Amino acid sequence: MKFKQDKDMLLFTSLHPILIMIYADLNWYAKSRHFVELTITDTISTLAEDKKLNRTSSSHRECRAIDIRTEQADLDPYIISDLIKYINSKPEYKRFHYLSNGGQKRLAYFHVGNAPHIH
């Protein structure tokens, strides 16, 4: 597992245990199917950090979200789409889906905030 910042490596085990399990599955899938290693760029945040990043959701503060880098050369749009489809379509994870502001039930999506990433 790769982390952009040491802070996030230290905070990783403080995330919700189900999120850790789901990420481990996604990371395994990315390695075994696409031969890429994912990089976690953000884990737990404070309210001040969220305000600075213009976040509208409390999911990072509540240990329910991570950001995964997608801008490296080996993560082309097909791979990004496949990773999101894989994690969102697993029947055993359906009960953990959340309802997005747009009314979609999902676990992961591609987002361009301060940089392109899977959230």
PLM regions with names:
Residues 1-4, 46, 72-74, 113:
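General structural signal for secondary-structure boundaries
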Residues 13, 56-64, 70-119:
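Catalytic cores and adjacent binding grooves of peptidoglycan-active enzymes
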